[in-house]
């Protein structure tokens, strides 16, 4: 997911997308125990997307606190 796509999301969308990606990562980790992944870069990309979204969520929280 691109940074501009993440920046366009609001807080609720970010929270739901983070939860969705974390569930997907957990599923992939489970299936990796059974059978090795064909593309190991999927894990790295998912973790990076989750980190980007959490960073954006923190930025939104800080903006809300400074505006309040």
Swiss-Prot record:
The keyword Ribonucleoprotein belongs to this UniProt entry's keyword annotation: yes
UniProt GO cellular component terms: ribonucleoprotein complex; ribosome
One term of GO molecular function: structural constituent of ribosome
Any GO BP annotation: translation
InterPro entries named among the record's database cross-references: Ribosomal_uL29, Ribosomal_uL29_CS, Ribosomal_uL29_sf
Keywords on record: Ribonucleoprotein, Ribosomal protein
UniProt family annotation: Belongs to the universal ribosomal protein uL29 family.
Name of the molecule in the record: Large ribosomal subunit protein uL29
Classification lineage: Bacteria, Pseudomonadati, Chlorobiota, Chlorobiia, Chlorobiales
């Amino acid at each position: 997911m691109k940074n501009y796509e993440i920046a366009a999301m609001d807080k609720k969308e970010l929270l739901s997308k983070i939860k969705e990606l974390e569930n997907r990562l957990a599923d992939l980790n489970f299936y990796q125990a059974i059978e090795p992944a064909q593309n190991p870069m999927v894990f790295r990309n998912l973790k990076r997307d989750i980190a980007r979204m959490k960073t954006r969520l923190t930025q939104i929280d800080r903006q809300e606190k400074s505006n309040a």
